[in-house]
């Protein structure tokens, strides 16, 4: 089955982003190396200020401390340097 790229992107935006997405670390990747909630909130605000995440997504992340606690500290700083961007 053949799909037109724009139609696929419109119908399945998240899947399209995974397939065509950038290899650069996202806000979640940066949150994984944080040690504290305060550091995580600082990272979220930085990404929001740069326009890399929406205000709504930033508010969602900041208003869910239990989610942040489950994300922070799950990756060692420097892993991308050692292993490269693809995992």
UniProtKB/Swiss-Prot annotation:
Organism: Archaeoglobus fulgidus (strain ATCC 49558 / DSM 4304 / JCM 9628 / NBRC 100126 / VC-16)
Family: To A.fulgidus AF_0255 and AF_1348.
InterPro entries named in the record: DUF2095 (IPR018662)
Xref: Pfam families: DUF2095 (PF09868)
UniProt-recorded name of the protein: Uncharacterized protein AF_1363
């Amino acid at each position: 089955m053949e799909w037109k790229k724009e139609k696929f992107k419109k119908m399945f935006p998240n899947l399209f982003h995974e397939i065509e997405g950038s290899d650069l670390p996202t806000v979640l990747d940066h949150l994984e190396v944080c040690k504290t909630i305060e550091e995580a909130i600082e990272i979220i605000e930085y990404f929001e200020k740069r326009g890399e995440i929406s205000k709504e997504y930033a508010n969602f992340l900041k208003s869910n401390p239990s989610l942040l606690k489950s994300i922070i500290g799950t990756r060692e700083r420097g892993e991308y340097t050692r292993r490269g961007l693809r995992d």
